[in-house]
Amino acid sequence: MLVNPATKYRPAATVDIPDRTWPGRTITRAPRWMSTDLRDGNQALIEPMNPARKLRLFEQLVKIGLKEIEVAFPAASQTDFDFVRMLIEERRIPDDVTIVVLTQSREDLIRRTVESVRGAARATVHLYNPIAPAWRRIVFNASRDEIKAVAVSGTRLIKALTDAMPETAWTYEYSPETFSLAELDFSLEVSDAVSAAWQAGPGRPMILNLPTTVECSTPNVFADQIEWMHRRLARRAHIVLSVHPHNDRGTAVAAAELALMAGADRVEGCLFGNGERTGNVDLVTLALNLYTQGVAPELDFSDIDAVRQCVEHCNQLPVHPRHPYVGDLVFTAFSGSHQDAIRKGFAQQQPDAIWEVPYLPIDPADLGRSYDAVIRVNSQSGKGGMAYLLEQVHGLYLPRRLQIEFSRAVQAMTDDTGLEASADDLYGLFRREYLARETPLRYVSHQLASDATGATAITVQMERDGQPCTVRGTGNGPIDAFIDALDLPVRVMDYHEHAMTAGADARAACYVEVRVGDSPTGFGAGIDASLVTASLRAVVSGVNRHLQAGFGARAQATQTASASAATEA
């Protein structure tokens, strides 16, 4: 790279509009959309689509709700010409859809293009020619007047040919290609000459499409260019002002949005931003940006994964996992703080209320996407993500302090493996840490009774280091009685329970925070169809975790438990 790039590159020209109005405007309705996936998108593919893939994508575009679809450059190849004829002759074009065909301003190409759409109910012929200084000088060696004459002569020929076919509802579109790099006064001169040649007026509108053929400036400069043209165009009331942003600088979406604020009525682009070089503006992102602002986009992406699968198949190009709204990871949070906020947002979000879940600008369900991948756990994650997955997939609602305790084990596992932990991975770890802790004590069965004072009496069949034993105790409820039976210095510090499922076969989960002797507190967990059994299993789990960890009370607890087992055996 150059130390001083100004010796090789010059900044884009700016537009002097002291009273520009677009910065104070908002977009309150959807523009007219035109998909150029089958033309601009197709010509940019390493392997252009065959007719079957083109037809599949055409049908997907119709299903989404697009009413203007650029289907081909018919004069470029017999394949493109035949595809247009197939759509017309097999009556595959819905009555409310207009197909668009592109041509350069050469007589033979124009005649071939118009012939390709003979018999169509509705069609737009789209003419373009480059007008910027570099193209005039380097590519065509032509003057401004010569370039304007090319556009006007092509327009007149298209008018004559289409006027001779009144059975078709014709629309004319003109693009001064390289508009974003051209002088504004010349762009206006050519555009006005073209609209005059077409005789744009009441009942005879035309589309003027202003492209960023090569994106060369910040989006605000393009917005200024659009507002400048919007204010000065002759016959503006009979012109649909369209934009066709490319993404060379990565700001095509912003350029399109600001252009709409500046007076544009229509946007051309491709699904997921396919197109030459870095692509055309992404119609999906534009539409869903409107949707998240409460503006109906008039396009249907309620099954966005199906749309993506179709586009990936037809284009033979993958959609990036970070692509807005549709990528595999765009609704995924690995960060602990993000996960915690999302989890709390889901818990508070009410049906039919304004969407306010942190970090999620749109409800994935609106796009037909599930919540399964919203929170995923790796070494960067915290307790919130782990807790959310256990809740959603396995029905375990861990109390907050248990979340903190278990998150340490999760962190150790993900640090060790360097891999993402799935919901099943987390459940397996939880089972190993809590549910399957059966040494040195293992619960087998129990019987409950009440004595004359109303206290609970319990008899528990257990194993101690693999040896059967029976312990008995009394207390104020089953847990208190069980602790009495264990004859250990155990205190229950906290207790939580919940049903994991509904119905006759429902299971209960219990979480017990215990302290053995003067050791730190720790949790145990148990699951069973019986709530009492689940709570007893949780106590055993908590005690075993303390004993296996070698806390201060271990020696005393082991000695006492051994004595009890010997007495009762």
Swiss-Prot record:
Keywords, in A-Z order: Amino-acid biosynthesis, Branched-chain amino acid biosynthesis, Cytoplasm, Leucine biosynthesis, Magnesium, Metal-binding, Transferase
Binding site for Mg(2+): D40, H244, H246, N280
Catalytic activity entry: 3-methyl-2-oxobutanoate + acetyl-CoA + H2O = (2S)-2-isopropylmalate + CoA + H(+)
Pathway: Amino-acid biosynthesis; L-leucine biosynthesis; L-leucine from 3-methyl-2-oxobutanoate: step 1/4
Coiled coil stretches, renumbered: none
GO cellular component: cytoplasm
Listed cofactors: Mg(2+)
Molecular function in Gene Ontology: 2-isopropylmalate synthase activity; acetyl-CoA C-acetyltransferase activity; magnesium ion binding
Main localisation: cytoplasm
All copies of domain Pyruvate carboxyltransferase, residue ranges: 31-305
Subcellular location, record wording: Cytoplasm
GO annotation, biological process: L-leucine biosynthetic process
Region listing for Regulatory domain, in residue ranges: 437-569
InterPro entries linked: 2-isopropylmalate_synth_dimer, AIPM/Hcit_synth_CS, Aldolase_TIM, IPM_Synthase, LeuA-like_post-cat, LeuA_allosteric_dom_sf, LeuA_N_DRE-TIM, PYR_CT
EC number: 2.3.3.13
UniProt cross-references to NCBIfam families, sorted A to Z: leuA_yeast, PRK03739.1
UniProt subunit comment: Homodimer.
Protein role: Catalyzes the condensation of the acetyl group of acetyl-CoA with 3-methyl-2-oxobutanoate (2-ketoisovalerate) to form 3-carboxy-3-hydroxy-4-methylpentanoate (2-isopropylmalate).
Stated family: Belongs to the alpha-IPM synthase/homocitrate synthase family. LeuA type 2 subfamily.
Name of this chain's protein: 2-isopropylmalate synthase
